[in-house]
UniProtKB/Swiss-Prot annotation:
It comes from the Bacteria. The gene is ureG. Its main location: cytoplasm. One of its GO terms (biological process) is urea catabolic process. GO terms for cellular component: cytoplasm. Belongs to the SIMIBI class G3E GTPase family. UreG subfamily. It comes from Helicobacter pylori (strain ATCC 700392 / 26695). Facilitates the functional incorporation of the urease nickel metallocenter. This process requires GTP hydrolysis, probably effectuated by UreG. InterPro entries: CobW/HypB/UreG_nucleotide-bd, P-loop_NTPase, UreG. This is Urease accessory protein UreG.
């Protein structure tokens, strides 16, 4: 089972990305999802209503505190959810774990996630990639979402591209508009090539 952590600031499009990935990949792969919210299970409920996956393949973890603690310093609740999900589905191939909304320093405990996708959105401004932080610099894949909003918020995608290359070196990043499925195929191709080790 490959575990992919998806993290990023509130509203960046983490849940939309996971919903789109499950919709496009669950027919070919044995998949499940774990979501994290501080005080609710809202993201899990959204997934249950909007995903093609049955409810038993989605677990919502209510962290009750700082979102990055639940995925990094004390990942015990999430590790228990991973164990529970693996018990339910022993042949699970791909488990997507969504963090609660957090800042640019969010990273996953290596026991919890084999790969990390960090999601930011253009509406936060074109300066976000150059601000760095572990989410930007260390994630396996950086997704820059909501590119359709760039002209409305004064964000320059060329600046974001330049700064992403500078901050990430050889590590990949993908521009997306998840709602319109733009860039989604590139994210799926990255997952298949890097996480699932397909050609």
């Amino acid at each position: 089972m490959v575990k992919i952590g998806v993290c990023g600031p509130v509203g960046s499009g983490k849940t939309a990305l996971i919903e789109a990935l499950t919709r496009h990949m669950s027919k070919d792969y044995d998949m499940a999802v774990i979501t994290n919210d501080i005080y609710t299970k809202e993201d899990a409920e959204f997934m249950c209503k909007n995903s093609v996956m049955p409810r038993e393949r989605i677990i919502g973890v209510e962290t009750g505190g700082c979102p990055h603690t639940a995925i990094r310093e004390d990942a015990s609740m999430n590790l228990e959810a991973v164990e529970e999900m693996h018990g339910r589905f022993p042949n699970l191939e791909l488990l997507l774990i969504e963090s609660g909304g957090d800042n640019l320093s969010a990273t996953f405990n290596p026991e919890l996630a084999d790969f990390t996708i960090f999601v930011i959105d253009v509406a936060e401004g074109d300066k976000i990639p150059r601000k760095g932080g572990p989410g930007i610099t260390r994630s396996d894949l950086l997704v820059i979402n909501k590119i359709d909003l760039a002209p409305y918020v004064g964000a320059d995608l060329k600046v974001m591209e330049r700064d992403s290359k500078k901050m990430r070196g050889e590590k990949p990043f993908i521009f997306t508009n998840i709602r319109a499925k733009e860039g989604l195929d590139d994210v799926i191709a990255w997952i298949k090539r890097n996480a699932l080790l397909e050609d």
